[in-house]
C-alpha cells in the first residue's frame, strides 16, 4: 500500500485564503481518494477507482473513478485520473463530472499539470484548471508551476492567470508514504 497526504493553500484575487486537503491511497490496483474543499468550499468527497497502467519507457496510467460529495455541494460523480511519465517529462490530469442531488446544474472539474524535471529535485511546468472553488472570471485558468522534492516531501507553487488582474496563487505541499 502507498499513498499521500496533500494540502493546497490558495490565495484568490480578492485575497481570500482557500484550503484544499487530499488524502490518496493505492492498494494493489485500486485507488482511493478523500478530499475536502476540492469540489466546493466546506465540502467533503470520497472517490474510488481501478488503476490501469502500461508502458515502460513511456509509463501511462488511467484511473476511472466514481465518488460522492457532501457539504455545500451534495452529489455523485464520475472522474478520471491520467498520468504519463516519459523520462524527465510528466503530464498529469484529473477530471470529474459532479451531478448535484438538488437538481442544480452539473459541474465539470479539471486540473492538469505538465512539468519537466531539470534536476532530481526541481521541476518547473505549466498548469491549467477549471475549479468551482476559486470562482475566477475565467472559465479556464492557465498558469505556471515550480516544484521541488526532498525525499518523500514535495512542494509546488502555482501561479494562475499570472499576467492579468485575475491572478491567484496556490501552494501545494505533499507527503508520500
Per-region residue spans from a language model:
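A short, structured active-site edge motif that brings together acidic residues
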Residues: 63-68
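N-terminal carbohydrate-binding/catalytic regions of secreted carbohydrate-active enzymes
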Residues: 33-34
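Amphipathic alpha-helical scaffolding segments comprising HEAT/armadillo-like alpha-solenoid repeats
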Residues: 59-61
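Beta-strand-dominated lipid-handling architectures at cellular/organellar boundaries
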Residues: 1
Amino acid at each position: 500500500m502507498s499513498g499521500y497526504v496533500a494540502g493546497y493553500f490558495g490565495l484568490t484575487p480578492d485575497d481570500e485564503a482557500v484550503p484544499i486537503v487530499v488524502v490518496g491511497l493505492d492498494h494493489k490496483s485500486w485507488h482511493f481518494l478523500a478530499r475536502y474543499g476540492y469540489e466546493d468550499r466546506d465540502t467533503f468527497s470520497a472517490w474510488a477507482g481501478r488503476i490501469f497502467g502500461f508502458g515502460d519507457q513511456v509509463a501511462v496510467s488511467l484511473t476511472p473513478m466514481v465518488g460522492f460529495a457532501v457539504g455545500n455541494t451534495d452529489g455523485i460523480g464520475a472522474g478520471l485520473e491520467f498520468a504519463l511519465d516519459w523520462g524527465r517529462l510528466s503530464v498529469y490530469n484529473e477530471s470529474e463530472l459532479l451531478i448535484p442531488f438538488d437538481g442544480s446544474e452539473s459541474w465539470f472539474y479539471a486540473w492538469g499539470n505538465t512539468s519537466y524535471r531539470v534536476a532530481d529535485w526541481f521541476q518547473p511546468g505549466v498548469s491549467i484548471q477549471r475549479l468551482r472553488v476559486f470562482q475566477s472570471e475565467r472559465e479556464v485558468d492557465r498558469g505556471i508551476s515550480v516544484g521541488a522534492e526532498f525525499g518523500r516531501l514535495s512542494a509546488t507553487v502555482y501561479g494562475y492567470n499570472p499576467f492579468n488582474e485575475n491572478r491567484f496563487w496556490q501552494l501545494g505541499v505533499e507527503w508520500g508514504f
